[in-house]
C-alpha cells in the first residue's frame, strides 16, 4: 500500500519546510506549494488525502484551494494567524488551525482526518 499523501500550501518557506519534515517523519508523503498557482498544479497531478492551506497567500485566498481540494475528495484544513478576523468568524467546512501552530498539532490533525500512515515492512 502507498503512504497517504498530504498537500501543504504555505508561502512562508521556513514554516512550510518545518511542517513538511514533521509530517514526513510521521510517515506521510508531503508536497509543499508556496502559492495558489503551485497548489492548483499539484492538485491536477496528485490525489491528496489531506490538503492544509494558509489563508493569506501571496497570490490569493487559501480557502479557494480548499474548495478545489474538497471537490476532489480531500479532507481540508485552514491555518492562519488571522482566523478571528475572517468574515463569518470560525464557521468553516474544514478544520482550522490558529498560528502559531505546534508542529505536532498538524500531525494530530492529519491522523484524525485519515489515520496513521501505512507501515512498510522491510
What are these regions (language model features)?
Residues 101-122:
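C-terminal output helix
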Residues 32-50:
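Acidic, metal-coordinating helix/loop segments flanking the phosphotransfer/catalytic sites
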Residues 58:
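The feature encodes the CheY-like receiver
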Residues 54:
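Active-site residues of response regulator receiver
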Residues 13-31:
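Two-component/phosphorelay signaling modules centered on CheY-like receiver
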Residues 10:
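Conserved acidic carboxylate
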Residues 63-74, 83:
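Short amphipathic alpha-helix used as the core "switch/output" element in two-component signaling
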Residues 79-81:
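Hydrophobic/aromatic residues positioned on beta-strands within the core alpha/beta folds
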